[in-house]
Structures are given as structure tokens and as C-alpha cells.
A protein has these predicted regions:
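C-terminal catalytic/substrate-binding lobe primarily of soluble NAD(P)-dependent oxidoreductases
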Residues: 1-169
């Protein structure tokens, strides 16, 4: 994946973390993948917060910075659709880091990165330049396991910044 944060996204993330630091009750809400599904608690979900070896794809994976937001939205969609994905639906997003010991080392290193720590990152109103947006890209693998153990893969790719090229015109 090659892309950049908008300043608004960075500011929202920093403000959310600052609010959670002041009000520990927010931490449980932020940690719950079902925070946007009132009254519904689905199947146990992976935390997505630590590097691990993913047995479905047989590779090491690292936490993805947008997963805490995205997973809530996916579970809300399932909720609004009347659990069309199933009551036992499990969803997580991680970044593939690689295979073997090198993959493990890469996953551990990626997990320690915080691209928005301190004063890093764009300010509100800033974001990737036109050139950065046009030269961005992404390659996403959705690996699903059916109840009978059958694996279904879907790949989504884009030749622009993932936050702008495919979501904004």
C-alpha cells in the first residue's frame, strides 16, 4: 500500500486517543468491534493489535492503522443488513508483512511504527499532494473461511492513493 493521511484523519485520530487517555471508559468502547451495533454482540473477534502468524494465508501480519475504524463499520453494515453475513461473522484487517523469520521481524517492526506520533503527520486541511495521490496504490486480499473450511479469496487493487483515488472523485 502506498498512500498518505489527510490532516483531518490524523487530527481525529489524535483527538480520539487524547480523549481516551483522559476518560478510560472510552477505551472499552474504542476497543469493541461492535461499538456501532447497539444491543448486538457478535462472535469473538481478533484484536488486530499484535503481530501474528495468520494461518489462513500462512504469512506474518501486523496491525493496520485504520482497522479499528474499518472493523466497526463492517460490523455495523452486517448489523444493518440483519446479520446477512451471519451471527458468527468474524472480521479483521491486518497488513501482510511476509513469510518466515523475515516476515515475523517485519511484522514486529511495523507494529511499533506510529506514523502520527507527536507532531508527525499532516495538519488539518493538509494531505497528500496531487502527485502523491496519483502515484499511490493498494493491493488488498480478502481471505474468507466458510463454515465448512472452504477458503474464498478476493483481491481488490487500485492505482491511486487508497484514501483518495478510489473513494473521492
Amino acid at each position: 500500500m502506498k498512500g498518505g493521511f489527510s490532516g483531518g484523519t490524523a487530527a481525529s485520530l489524535k483527538a480520539t486517543m487524547a480523549a481516551a487517555a483522559k476518560d478510560p471508559s472510552l477505551i472499552a468502547l474504542l476497543a469493541s468491534p461492535f461499538a456501532l451495533t447497539p444491543g448486538h454482540k457478535g462472535a469473538h473477534q481478533p484484536t488486530g493489535l499484535i503481530p501474528e502468524h495468520d494461518t489462513t494465508i500462512d504469512a506474518w501480519v501486523a496491525p493496520f492503522v485504520m482497522a479499528p475504524i474499518n472493523t466497526k463499520n463492517v460490523h455495523r453494515t452486517n448489523f444493518l443488513l440483519g446479520q446477512r453475513y451471519g451471527d458468527d461473522f468474524v472480521y479483521d484487517e491486518m497488513m501482510v508483512a511476509g513469510l518466515g523469520e523475515m516476515g515475523k521481524a517485519a511484522a514486529e517492526a511495523l507494529a511499533k511504527l506510529n506514523p502520527l506520533a507527536g507532531d508527525k503527520g499532516p495538519k488539518p486541511g493538509e494531505g497528500p499532494t496531487k502527485e502523491e495521490r496519483e502515484n499511490g496504490s493498494y493491493d488488498v486480499l480478502f481471505a474468507g473461511l466458510m463454515p465448512d473450511g472452504t477458503r474464498i479469496d478476493a483481491v481488490v487493487t487500485g492505482d491511486r492513493d487508497p484514501g483518495y483515488g478510489s473513494t473521492l472523485s
